[in-house]
Amino acid sequence: MKVGFVGLGNMGSAMAHNLIKAGHTLTVYNHTRGRAEEFRPLGATVAETPGEAASGAEAFITMVADDRAVEGVIFGQGKVIESLPAGGVHICMCTISVALSHRLLAAHRGQKQHFIAAPVFGRPDAAAAAKLFIAVAGSAEQITRCQPLFDAMGQRTFVVGDDAPAASLVKVTGNFLITTVIESLGEAFALIRKSGVDPGKFLEVLTGSLFSSPVYRTYGGMIAADNFEPVGFSMPLGMKDNRLVLAAAEEAAVPMPMASLVRDRMLAATAQGLGDADWAAIARISLREAGL
């Protein structure tokens, strides 16, 4: 497929590489031009603007940081809403608010374009290995049309509904669950350490028995080692996603006390000098509260 791709950070860069490997034709754009230029030797076209990347594209992928960045690309100076051809599909693969997902769906329909929300679960190493999990919502016809793209980037695609905002909600709710696991692990390892038990042995028990999922293995390993480098998902992005799930919960009148707790943990981590760390560093708050 002819694909426009905007957002070549750690995740987007790996995803774009895999699309090229799979034989798709890419036109790329990144706010920091040097990241885009890295793709020129691979056969990609480097666009001057997001709108240029979307012009003539069958599919246009956004993998940027937040709602503001997506809005800038689609409605602002990027002007993708004007340049994506009728019949083209915008695939938003980043984590955005449910409200923005609704707005994008309506705006693209108004231009006779299509919109799919397809946020991903996985860190940069999973993106590089094409092992992402992709939650997709939108029209069945467009999802089928875009499946080769998803296959190039991920190990499994989950269709969660025919209304694009459903995937955005699944993503922010899934990220909420990850943060609750991180918080629980932080508390558990604080108890283990203060009681003199080997954190590595505790991790072995967890991941070798009932807690063998990637979330427990990845974050349990980081917390057991008290090592949060390299940063795979930063604290500011974690705080952004926490705000998104709390906003969705407020809209639906659903209390989420754990989300509020995690929000305070992230604020505490930021106040204590961990604002640039991986979001898993909230586990250090439990250590400090335990006097460790």
Describe the function of each predicted region.
Residues 1-63, 88, 93, 124, ...:
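NAD(P)+-binding Rossmann beta1-loop-alpha1 motif at the extreme N-terminus of oxidoreductases
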Residues 15-16, 35, 104, 149, ...:
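Hydrophobic residues within alpha-helices
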Residues 26, 46, 115-116, 157, ...:
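Hydrophobic beta-strand scaffold residues
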Residues 50-114:
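Rossmann-fold NAD(P) dinucleotide-binding segment
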Residues 95-176:
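Rossmann-fold dinucleotide-binding core
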Residues 164-290:
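Helical "substrate-binding/catalytic lid" subdomain
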